[in-house]
């Protein structure tokens, strides 16, 4: 793919650990793949801190992750990316999804939501909140952003397929409320994207191969 100019002859991989602990053997394997491919094919690896959960991130672990990556001998072009660099873009993407009826705000309690997702042998049931007008969802998402609700009171879900054989694809949560100051953005945000929502957007922005 690199030789076909699909990526403009610039191969980019990424290593995106969450700075909530020290790197372990699983991280080392992932780093070996991302860093190794970049090195083998003359590309570059992005070191990106997955700081989407303000309750768990720690500056000490960010520092230690960088030191361990350097100690293992992998190049990251002396630049550290952060998921939080893209919070504004992710928020706009989420709003665009709502406008296109691809996401909705849900006030269903967590336990009930899990129950309504169904099982491996039964389809899930979509929340009644999903049937509200798009204008309602945009307004409630704005209320979430403005700190009107407590943690866990509601969330934003992607409108996918409640009959999917993969339960994780049954309208997954893509934004949740966390009224905890962020290590980099302080109190600028009180809603945060989930891992599965954030990473494809980050990869797209950084032009990861």
Walk through the language-model features, giving the residues of each.
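N-terminal Rossmann-like or analogous alpha/beta NTP/dinucleotide-binding catalytic cores
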Residues: 1-125
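Active-site cores that bind ATP or allylic diphosphates and position pyrophosphate for catalysis
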Residues: 99-209
